[in-house]
A protein has these predicted regions:
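An acidic/histidine-cluster motif and surrounding catalytic segment
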Residues: 1-110, 119-156
Length: 156
């Protein structure tokens, strides 16, 4: 798995923790081991530009996902497809505000948003209530299991 992290924000982060989380989620979702993913962290003005350009919505957002080869989660007994999973753009300043409101660390919020972004790249969505329930339960399970395996007690 090739996972590139480009930090263009002022936020100091543990890139290895982001990469470990991404690898864990991709592994659990049975993404091909040679799949590529790019994580980019940007400041609020850069995220706002992307949000307006791609979603036609004002202001910065927390996470945006840009799928490339439209890979889907692997199925038992089938070889997963190779390819580029896509790009995930995270905005640490927005994540920090959300983390404060939720009562947990910014780093945990970024891991949550990363997990959310990977699920979007794999075709999950939350436009409908049943889709939202499925996606949010899956992202919570994936993240809490990842954090527990690393000895973290999540405040999520």
């Amino acid at each position: 798995m090739s996972i590139d992290v480009l930090n263009e924000s002022d936020f100091a982060l543990d890139e290895m923790e982001l990469v470990a989380c991404a690898k864990y989620v991709m592994g659990e979702m049975k993404v091909h081991p040679q799949a590529d993913l790019c994580l980019k962290l940007v400041d609020a003005p850069a995220m706002e530009v992307l949000h307006v350009q791609w979603m036609d919505l004002p202001g910065p957002t927390d996470v945006m996902s840009f799928p490339m080869d439209e890979l889907r989660p692997g199925r038992d007994g089938q070889e997963p497809a190779e390819g580029v999973l896509g790009d995930i753009v995270l905005c640490p300043s927005v994540a920090g505000r959300q983390a404060l409101d939720a009562g947990h660390a910014t780093e945990e919020e970024l891991l949550l948003l990363l997990t959310h972004g990977i699920l979007h790249l794999l075709g999950y969505d939350h436009a409908e209530p049943d889709e939202e329930r499925e996606m949010f339960e899956l992202q919570r399970t994936l993240l809490l299991t990842f954090l527990a395996g690393r000895g973290h007690r999540a405040g999520l």
